[in-house]
Amino acid sequence: MKKIKIDVVALPLSGHLYPTMNLLAPLLQNPQYEIRLFTGPQKKAVTEAVGFQVLPILEGHVKEFEKAANNKEQLGIISAYRQLSASLDLINLVSDQLIQEWTNHCPDIAIVDFITLSGGLVAEQMGIPWITTMATQFAIETTDGSPCFFGGMGTPRNSWQVLQQFLARKITHLGKRIVTFLLRDRLRRYHFKLYSQKGQETIYSPYSILGIGMKEVELKRGFPKHYKWVGPSGASVEAVEDYPLDLSVFPNRKKVLVTCGTQLAWAKDNLLYQAKELAKAHPDCHFFVTRGVGGQPFKCENLMENLSVVSYLPYKEYIPQMDYVIHHGGAGIFYQCIIYGKPALILPHDYDQFDYAVRGVEAGVAFSAKRDSSKAIGQAFEELLAKENWPELETLRQAAQSYHPTEMLEREIHRLLEDKEKEK
């Protein structure tokens, strides 16, 4: 039987790379598939340990990538534009590598993370069927429902909020057109058009989009017909034995994980300060603050009797051992809390995190507070501790188990390849 050659393209950011890796990892044992993964050299070791054949991208440009990917403060309109502009040079470098590689070794299908623009742009140019994996399930524009990236718009409660959300969708549309116009010269090589004839964004696959998340918590409506929900798959992939933390020595305290992920370096000092304030007020809890620095020797420092700072903790292994989680609203940690039935306090910082926070609150699985307000955080944490029953969380925990991500991925792979055959 002829092998199906699959090339995966994802930036070396945990929140983007790991969900796509977890979708594909079960296929590594299937002799029907030949899978290669294009990602940054800084993630080469951890991806190879899972079993992927890795082709590094942006070798020699790690510093430039880290500078573009890790902003020094919360993004605004101007800083977001600058970040995108700086990223375009890197996007073109990756595109050049993909064109060269795919000219010599063309895959049958490409699977591309939703912000790794090079993969989709080049696949479309070369006539390669491709699938978008969307770790931020609501990033795509839709025809109805709460728009994202406006500070966390929830379900509209009145006609004014309905109008606000309508205008926000229009602003999103206009803003993207303006940015595309400003960058038109640098995008010319791709013959880039922002929207297709159907009015859908061309940076995502016109054939198949896999939403890595749960429809049950989504506030948007009007997704494209080729958008499929595959459930959450953003678990960490690091080996737990590399990050040894014995939680059995804290039997009489509530255990609380505190994290703002692997990015947001500018936010981590404030997070530690807020954790210290909570630790002072709650001696019956032990707080474990993770700095999100993986791939290095594990470190654990006890700053207070009931507060420990660790370099990194794989969520999949340690969240089940916690009682509560305080996090930033990243997609991965948001769903890990649901999967393991852990109530959360969300302190959104940037990007899509305000949108995940409002979804968590409306779903009844989390509280939320402003990240730099000790008073608001303290009050929200008191509410978190006081709430004894979490029926919505249990319902969603069970719903999360009903998804079959890899099965859906396989169906889409074969559907696209069959469609390609029909075109011949």
Each language-model region and where it sits:
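Conserved nucleotide-sugar phosphate-binding/catalytic loop shared by glycosyltransferases and other
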Residues: 37-81, 162
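A donor-sugar binding/catalytic signature common to diverse glycosyltransferases
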Residues: 24, 110-112, 312-358
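Active-site-proximal region of nucleotide-activated glycan assembly enzymes
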Residues: 131-219
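C-terminal amphipathic helix plus adjacent low-complexity
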Residues: 376-424
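Conserved nucleotide-sugar donor-interacting segment of glycosyltransferase catalytic cores
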Residues: 88-163, 216
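N-terminal subdomain of nucleotide-sugar transferases
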Residues: 1-56
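Donor-nucleotide binding loops and adjacent catalytic segments primarily
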Residues: 213-324
